[in-house]
């Protein structure tokens, strides 16, 4: 697959303006990225602007804390799909995971998967807040809940993806679930490390820099 198709071109800052959203949409169309990932308030606009494009619209649910109620996450998902979202990146209930309330975590994910009605669901487990066993368990619950991807990070918790965590997640979920690496993927070197570790989607605000690095690379 072309490397550009691995990238969710991302802008999730709370102060994001319409001008900045326009910029990432234009960049995504120019570089043929897989999607633009924007906050729910921008989904309808992005979907309208990308209607004549292969670029998908990705949005975030229960973001960035994961601490919304399950019903709220399900409604957010339904609303996002209605507004034109193609893909949903949700945040798990991190506290419930740490409590050992695994049924609650799985049911939370399942509610979003159901609300997404067949659209791609990626589950953010916020690896920087988890230990090894918690990363494994969160990945297992993601798979059991029927989601499509397990994702490392929101980028809002003080850390992002590491190749070690990506490999652990991939080893845990196997072939049935994909892994998205996000948070701190800023250049071609970072991108390559994540892909080599098993990521098949990269969430990054630095998609253009990554592609420029690829273009400069003799193997491109």
Curated annotation (Swiss-Prot):
> Which biological process terms from the Gene Ontology are attached to this UniProt entry?
2-deoxyribose 1-phosphate catabolic process; carbohydrate catabolic process; deoxyribonucleotide catabolic process
What this protein catalyses is: 2-deoxy-D-ribose 5-phosphate = D-glyceraldehyde 3-phosphate + acetaldehyde
Q: Which Pfam families match?
A: DeoC
Which residues does the entry assign to the active site, renumbered to this chain?
A: 89 (proton donor/acceptor), 151 (schiff-base intermediate with acetaldehyde), 180 (proton donor/acceptor)
The pathway entry for this protein reads as:
Carbohydrate degradation; 2-deoxy-D-ribose 1-phosphate degradation; D-glyceraldehyde 3-phosphate and acetaldehyde from 2-deoxy-alpha-D-ribose 1-phosphate: step 2/2
According to its UniProt record, where is this protein located? Cytoplasm
Write out the entry's keywords from A to Z. Answer: Cytoplasm, Lyase, Schiff base
Recorded family membership: Belongs to the DeoC/FbaB aldolase family. DeoC type 1 subfamily.
HAMAP family assigned to the protein according to its UniProt record, in alphabetical order = DeoC_type1
- What PANTHER family does the entry give? DEOXYRIBOSE-PHOSPHATE ALDOLASE (PTHR10889:SF1)
Q: What does this protein do?
A: Catalyzes a reversible aldol reaction between acetaldehyde and D-glyceraldehyde 3-phosphate to generate 2-deoxy-D-ribose 5-phosphate.
For this entry, the protein name equals Deoxyribose-phosphate aldolase 2
Instruction: State the species of origin.
Output: Staphylococcus aureus (strain MSSA476)
């Amino acid at each position: 697959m072309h490397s550009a198709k691995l990238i969710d071109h991302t802008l999730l800052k709370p102060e994001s303006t319409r001008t900045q959203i326009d910029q990432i949409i234009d960049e995504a169309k120019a570089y043929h990225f897989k999607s633009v990932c924007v906050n729910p308030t921008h989904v309808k606009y992005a979907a309208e602007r990308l209607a004549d494009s292969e670029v998908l619209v990705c949005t975030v649910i229960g973001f960035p804390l994961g601490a919304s109620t399950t019903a709220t996450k399900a409604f957010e998902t339904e609303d996002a799909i209605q507004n034109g979202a193609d893909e949903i990146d949700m945040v798990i209930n991190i506290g419930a995971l740490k409590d050992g309330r695994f049924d609650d975590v799985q049911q939370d994910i399942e509610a979003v998967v159901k609300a997404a009605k067949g659209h791609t669901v990626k589950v953010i487990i916020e690896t920087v807040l988890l230990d090894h066993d918690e990363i494994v368990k969160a990945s297992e619950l993601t798979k059991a809940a029927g989601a499509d991807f397990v994702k490392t990070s929101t980028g809002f918790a003080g850390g992002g993806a590491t190749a070690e965590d990506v490999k652990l997640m991939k080893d845990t979920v196997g072939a049935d679930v994909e892994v998205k690496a996000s948070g701190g993927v800023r250049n071609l070197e970072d991108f390559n490390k994540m892909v080599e570790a098993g990521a098949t989607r990269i969430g990054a605000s630095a998609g253009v820099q990554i592609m420029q690095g690829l273009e400069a690379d003799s193997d491109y």
